[in-house]
Amino acid sequence: MGAPSPDQDIAAIRRNYQRASLRRVDLDADPVEQFRRWLQQAIAADLQESTAMVLSTFDGKRPSSRTVLLKAFDKRGFVFFTNYGSRKAQDISAHPNVSLLFPWYDLERQVAIMGPAERISRAESQAYFSSRPFGSRLGVWVSQQSQVISSRQILKMKWQEMNRRFANGEVPLPEFWGGFRVVPTEFEFWQGRENRLNDRFRYRPQQDSHHAQTWRIERLAP
């Protein structure tokens, strides 16, 4: 079959989801462990950018979204890194509640995570920064993220300047760069099904009889 016509009616483009199902009995009681299971399956399936997630923030007037990479997660939350002067970081400073979305299209799955984002410790940021390749560490110093620049030549000149400055290979962690941790208050796991009768399960925190936090799991209508 040839490539679709650029004039094709996009309303007619559809795919019938039938790869898998999701039942309540299949779910781990801990949403972080359920996420780990699905992420491992996404990695095993060799999906392109399986750790990519859409981060949505709010500046008080309008939302904005962008793709960032998950770099760590545990029961405390989900970590990504950015320039603290970026639009996303400024949004978070004023309105910390955000959402994350992992769209694993080839598995007909997605996971949405909601909760407040908070800065991680400098020690945690340093540990990750030190693990990055030289060029990636240098790039942090080159770009004033989200600022208007007149041309790409500005970046090339700044790169040359930073390359000379850190020619010995020792690139320090700048004060303006580091990580955020999204502390989850809600999860939704979505599995595509035939006829758009998709499986959706939501996790929300609750306390058990011993006042320990557990998670309530609810099936949602598609």
Swiss-Prot record:
Catalysed conversion reaction: pyridoxamine 5'-phosphate + O2 + H2O = pyridoxal 5'-phosphate + H2O2 + NH4(+); pyridoxine 5'-phosphate + O2 = pyridoxal 5'-phosphate + H2O2
Keyword Cell membrane: no
Pathway the protein takes part in: Cofactor metabolism; pyridoxal 5'-phosphate salvage; pyridoxal 5'-phosphate from pyridoxamine 5'-phosphate: step 1/1; Cofactor metabolism; pyridoxal 5'-phosphate salvage; pyridoxal 5'-phosphate from pyridoxine 5'-phosphate: step 1/1
GO molecular function: FMN binding; pyridoxamine phosphate oxidase activity
SUPFAM superfamilies: FMN-binding split barrel
Enzyme Commission identifier(s): 1.4.3.5
PROSITE patterns, per the entry: PYRIDOX_OXIDASE
Keywords: Flavoprotein, FMN, Oxidoreductase, Pyridoxine biosynthesis
Residues the entry annotates as binding substrate: R14, R15, N16, Y17, K71, Y128, R132, S136, R196, L197, N198
Similarity annotation: Belongs to the pyridoxamine 5'-phosphate oxidase family.
The protein, known as: Pyridoxine/pyridoxamine 5'-phosphate oxidase
